[in-house]
């Protein structure tokens, strides 16, 4: 066994030699492990090598380079991203869309601060980068953690991937605060995006739709080596937790970021009136097409940090900032075809196939047409030149045809009366109450229709249903195509059948022993599931998450629901029992009865219940201190997620509302609480902290 010298006793030359030797060893072990599945050292020995390598770089920062293993190579692909709670929430901005609203924003700020029209008020203006928000945490000047924005309160740990972005320093320059969270945007330039797509196409891989999606997808790769091969960039523009603020203004903070070695946007400018802001907005708008990165507006922020703190927050956005969005972009292109897609419930959805055209830096080749009435109302025909509009990340829509360019032989579009997948009749159901036809035409093929089967399987495995890691949409489509999965039952017998099969799943393209083992473990972990998620996973029409929870709460067990629903003919006591469930009605009751009355569904359920156990709904605590009360949660929760808080409150007999009203009994407020807290004070509603809530409910 080699005795290692203490790192503090090494000379720079000795450290450099050991660093190079360790790098070569780790690279070789990575190759043996990830490419040849033939490791020669134990996990503990490998980890010891990595720790020594990283300790050398910490003690001798000059060893860190673009080729450093801690920067971009050798990190194992993660099974999934760990969650990180933002100590200071990464809240979104309110949007404005006109010059008039700029004046209103400035006037609103002045009113809140009690400033007269002539009192000085400085506001910064900067381009709104169209990328992925990211938070970088530095401690002692070193990058220790990076997280995506997520929902603003909880993001994903992407530290290993962020370390591969060359513009982001691993160590800040100068005298940075002991703790500093830098917020900014990860993006991809137009030139890099085009080059990446050329490489993707040459390799026969997926072409990315736009630079933003490409940047987001690249940063969220489970394998940091993939991210390292993607040309990502970063602009710093805000901060979260900071042990001290190196400046007292927004512009000063950004200047400090630049001094620390962080990239900042050069188009940021200080303005002193609404007129200045509007002029800078239109100046940036005019330059937009010349920039090598996407922007979708201009962000205005009150410059004084002291005034920012006085202004505070409203709802999920700061009162001291707003985003002035650019108007929706339009273009004219050829409508090549109209294709019909069939969804999980049989809905036939028309999709426009367009001659590809670039709109706002994004290549658009598809657009939504909504339904057949929309096509008829706009008189859209195949072969038309059509005006399309794209606003932000919204799916492009067709505004209408350019009639003076319509071909003479263009015919009115005839919406199909049969399903294009299975050939079953496609009908528009009649509402028995109003006698009007549904706007959606649906395939009547049910489980005979392959398109519906695939979509139902996707729904079954989706996040809010069984949430099976590694069984996404693409995997389900492939497994269905290969005959491996046709019903939900097949998911839970996949491992057993694979063991007997001559063609193993691990030998298929895109799979290996590790990925297959992980998939089987993920499936096994879902053999016990809360009954409300089980009900939701079945994909019963009109039964979303809320109605699934209502059914579970009303009947307690799946067997009880099934027994009632199977006998719930029109006019029966069981139908009344279904109809009287809180939030239900005749339409939902009819849909549930239809589902359980269909013999194929009963057969699938019988097989599924041999594989899976729906766990009964916990009984509501009728004697808890919050039973029967309406509760609102607002702000950032530090001890539980919003979903966990909601589930806990409902389990204790409370009703959770999304807004504060006279019917609200209690508001639980965390950091960043805004308008809901103010509304509660206005209505004299009891408000408590998250800690007080946990004491109240005894958890």
Swiss-Prot record:
The keyword 4Fe-4S does not apply. SMART domains: BRCT, LIGANc. Its EC number is 6.5.1.2. PROSITE patterns: BRCT, DNA_LIGASE_N1, DNA_LIGASE_N2. Pfam families: BRCT, DNA_ligase_aden, DNA_ligase_OB, HHH_2. Coiled coil: none annotated. The lineage of its organism: Bacteria, Pseudomonadati, Pseudomonadota, Alphaproteobacteria, Hyphomicrobiales. PANTHER family: CHROMOSOME TRANSMISSION FIDELITY FACTOR 18 (PTHR23389), DNA LIGASE (PTHR23389:SF9). DNA ligase that catalyzes the formation of phosphodiester linkages between 5'-phosphoryl and 3'-hydroxyl groups in double-stranded DNA using NAD as a coenzyme and as the energy source for the reaction. It is essential for DNA replication and repair of damaged DNA. It comes from Beijerinckia indica subsp. indica (strain ATCC 9039 / DSM 1715 / NCIMB 8712). The active site is at 128 (n6-amp-lysine intermediate). Keywords: DNA damage, DNA repair, DNA replication, Ligase, Magnesium, Manganese, Metal-binding, NAD, Zinc. The keyword Zinc applies. This is DNA ligase.
């Amino acid at each position: 066994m080699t005795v290692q010298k203490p790192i503090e006793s090494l000379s720079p030359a000795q450290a450099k030699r050991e660093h190079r030797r360790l790098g070569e060893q780790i690279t070789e072990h990575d190759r043996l492990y990830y490419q040849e599945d033939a490791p020669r050292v134990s996990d503990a020995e490998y980890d010891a090598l990595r720790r020594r390598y990283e300790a050398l770089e910490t003690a001798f920062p000059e060893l860190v380079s673009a080729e450093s293993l801690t920067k971009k190579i050798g990190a194992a692909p993660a099974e999934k991203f760990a969650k990180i709670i933002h100590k200071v929430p990464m809240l979104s901005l309110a949007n404005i869309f006109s010059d008039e609203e700029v004046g209103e924003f400035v006037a609103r700020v002045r009113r809140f601060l009690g400033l007269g029209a002539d009192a000085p008020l400085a506001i910064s203006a900067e381009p709104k980068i169209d990328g992925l928000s990211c938070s970088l945490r530095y401690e002692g000047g070193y990058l220790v953690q990076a997280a995506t924005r997520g929902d603003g309160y909880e993001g994903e740990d992407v530290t290993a991937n962020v370390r591969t972005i060359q513009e982001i320093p691993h160590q800040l320059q100068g005298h940075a605060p002991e703790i500093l969270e830098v917020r900014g945007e990860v993006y991809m330039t137009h030139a890099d995006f085009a080059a990446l797509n050329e490489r993707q196409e040459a390799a026969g891989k997926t072409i990315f739709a736009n630079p933003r999606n490409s940047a987001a997808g690249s940063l969220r790769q489970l394998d940091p080596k993939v991210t390292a091969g993607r040309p990502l960039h970063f602009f710093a523009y805000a901060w979260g937790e900071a042990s001290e603020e190196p400046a007292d203004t927004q512009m000063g903070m950004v200047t400090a970021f630049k001094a620390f070695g962080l990239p900042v946007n050069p188009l940021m400018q200080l303005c002193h009136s609404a007129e200045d802001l509007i002029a800078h907005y239109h100046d940036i708008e005019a330059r937009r097409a010349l920039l090598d990165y996407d922007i979708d507006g201009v962000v205005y922020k009150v410059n004084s940090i002291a005034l920012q703190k006085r202004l505070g927050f409203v709802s999920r956005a700061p009162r001291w900032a707003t985003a002035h969005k650019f108007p929706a972009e339009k273009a004219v292109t050829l409508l090549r075809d109209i294709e019909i897609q069939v969804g999980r419930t049989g809905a036939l959805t028309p999709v426009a196939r367009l001659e590809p055209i670039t709109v706002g830096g994004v290549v658009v080749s598809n657009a939504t047409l909504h339904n057949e009435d929309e096509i008829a109302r706009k008189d859209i025909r195949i072969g038309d030149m059509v005006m399309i509009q794209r606003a932000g990340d919204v799916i492009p829509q067709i505004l209408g045809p350019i009639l003076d360019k319509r071909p003479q032989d263009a015919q009115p579009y005839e919406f199909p009366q049969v399903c294009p997948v299975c050939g079953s009749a496609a009908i528009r159901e009649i509402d028995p109450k109003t006698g009007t036809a549904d706007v959606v035409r649906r395939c009547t093929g049910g489980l005979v229709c392959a398109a519906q089967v695939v979509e139902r399987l996707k729904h079954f495995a989706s996040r809010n249903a069984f949430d099976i890691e590694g069984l996404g949409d693409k995997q389900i489509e492939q497994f269905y195509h290969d005959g491996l999965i046709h019903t939900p039952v097949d998911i839970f017998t996949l491992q057993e059948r694979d063991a007997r099969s001559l063609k193993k799943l691990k030998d298929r393209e895109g799979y290996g022993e590790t990925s297959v083992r992980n998939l089987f473990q993920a499936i096994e972990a879902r053999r016990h599931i809360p009954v409300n998620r089980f009900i939701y996973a079945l994909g019963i029409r009109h039964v979303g998450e809320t109605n699934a929870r209502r059914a579970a709460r009303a009947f307690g067990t799946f067997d009880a629901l099934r027994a009632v629903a199977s006998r719930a003919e029109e006019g029966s006591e069981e139908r009344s029992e279904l109809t009287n469930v809180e939030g239900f009605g005749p339409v939902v009751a009819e849909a549930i009865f239809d589902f359980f009355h269909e013999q194929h569904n009963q057969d699938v359920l019988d097989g599924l219940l041999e594989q899976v156990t729906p766990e009964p709904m916990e009984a509501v605590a009728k004697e808890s201190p919050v039973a029967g009360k309406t509760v609102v949660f607002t702000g950032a929760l530090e001890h539980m997620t919003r979903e966990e808080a909601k589930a806990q409150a409902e389990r204790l007999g409370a009703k959770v509302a999304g807004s504060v009203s006279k019917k609200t009994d209690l508001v639980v407020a965390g950091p960043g609480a805004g308008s809901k807290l103010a509304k509660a004070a206005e209505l004299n509603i009891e408000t408590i902290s998250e800690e007080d809530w946990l004491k109240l409910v005894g958890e």
